[in-house]
Structure formats: structure tokens, C-alpha cells
């Protein structure tokens, strides 16, 4: 059951919610836990349900921000250009970028790699290697393009979005990208904090 705008949460884990209740305390340190709430939907009787408490709104806000940019790039390019955001210079972010580049965006003509708002890590060489693939054979059985070798590298044009809040390795990666001549940098200068 979904909670919607207009529904009223009447209790959390058996504690009644009133106008004076500090409900934040009832959720403190419960991220990822199942909690029992009672919810009144409209004029009907309140119903109890278990939900999983979230950790913060950051993840949802970040996912929405990325999704909005993906949709904008897809719409403006007619689906010809892909968009990936590198959240951090770490292996989890790299796996997401790798998966999108060589999965969802494999048939795109180009990709925008957004490194803005990235706190750093140690990924510059991995990203540079991934984005600097040089295709040496195209697979097009009966005129249908299915891929290029190397299959595990991006072999098409790319550009990198940068910003003044790129920190540490996120400040170093644009230098590597530019020095190797992989593609264009777009945005505000990075602070040089690597």
C-alpha cells in the first residue's frame, strides 16, 4: 500500500502522532528497518502497514536529478546521445557508468559524462581507459549494428562536464581526459585539488 498526499499517519511503531509529537525522534536510527505505521486514507478507517524506513532523502533527490538530466539529453538529442553522472570516483560509481555506457547507451552516437558535484576518490585512470577505446572492427550482420571491438570500452565521442566543486580525483580526471585528447571539457574550471 502506498502513502499519498492527503493521507494522515496516525502512529509510528504504536506511538500516536499528534500535533505536538516530535515524530523525527520516532524514526531516528531506524534507516533500513521495518516500522509499523497506521495511516488514514480519506474518510475511511486507519489501516496498519509495515514500511521500510529510508536513510535520507539524498538518494532519492540524487536519483531524480540524474534521471531528469538523462531524460533531457535523450529528448534534446532524439535519443542519439547518452548521459551518465559519475557520483564519486569509486568502484560503485564506475560500475554504474560502465553498465550504462556499454549497456543502455551502447547504440548511442556519443555520451556526456558529468563529473560535477563529485567529491573524489581514485578513478581517473579507469575512466580514462574506459572512454579512450579505439574501435578496430564493427559488427554489422545484415546491416544491423550490434557492437564494436573492443567491446569493453567506449569507442565513440564523449565530452566531460566539469564544475568548480569537483574535488580531489574528480578535479584530476578532467586533466587526464584533456591531456590524452579523449574529448572536450565543458563547464566551469575545476579547482585543481588532486
At which residue positions do the language-model features occur?
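A short glycine-leucine-enriched loop at secondary-structure breakpoints
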Residues: 1-8, 26-30
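Cleft-lining beta-strand/loop regions that shape enzyme active-site pockets
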Residues: 15-194
